[in-house]
Amino acid sequence: FIASRNLIPAARFAHTLEGDDAEIAKAVEAGKKQFVGFELPGRTLGVIGLGAIGVQVANAALGLGLNVVGFDPGISVEHAWHLSAEVERADSMEEVFRRADILTVHVPLIPATRGLVSTQRLALMKETAVLLNFARAEIVDTDAVVAALDEGTLRGYVCDFPSTQVHKHPKCISLPHLGASTKEAERNCAIMAADSLRGFLEDGQVHNSVNFPEAVMA
């Protein structure tokens, strides 16, 4: 993904080229460095939050040749069972920030996670690291991220929460929030909602609740 993320801007660059073949070839050589990425095998993916999504991301990353280190002090027994033994458990969140070449956050937005990716934690990251946020916009202090990008202490930021701060930043890729924008995803969401309601009514169980144990049977 990191190496292919520039396909669209690279295609736009190609459309701006004018002149004969020789001139175009020179322009390509002069401009292609701006689209250089890096390959995933051997890199370290840091995962903050090992819930249902975080576990799937961590396990999938192993198949791409990444080393994976994760942190979640409240990981459930169910999610721990599904987490590959090859995923290294960090002793602290700060350890993940320090070690990651690519850092991805998968936590719900609650008071404790608002601004979780802060100036102080960003300062721990490698200058070559890339931050991914496909959870909630407010989990990341966007001002701090933009400052880190401008200062060269963070390589890139990828999110699906376009804002005026990151939309046109040269080191940011902001996508539409499309994670559930398929017919299959919408159907699965409806099924999960129905299953959750039935489970709560039948035995008081609520899976994937972000406010558990406050969700109690009246």
Give the predicted meaning of each segment.
Residues H169, L178-A218:
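NAD(P)-dependent dehydrogenase/reductase Rossmann-like domain
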Residues A58, L62, L149-D150:
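Gly/Ala-rich phosphate-binding loop of Rossmann-like dinucleotide-binding domains
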Residues V69, P73-V166, S181:
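Rossmann-like adenosine-cofactor binding region
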Residues G63-N67:
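Residues at the starts of beta-strands that form the adenosine-phosphate
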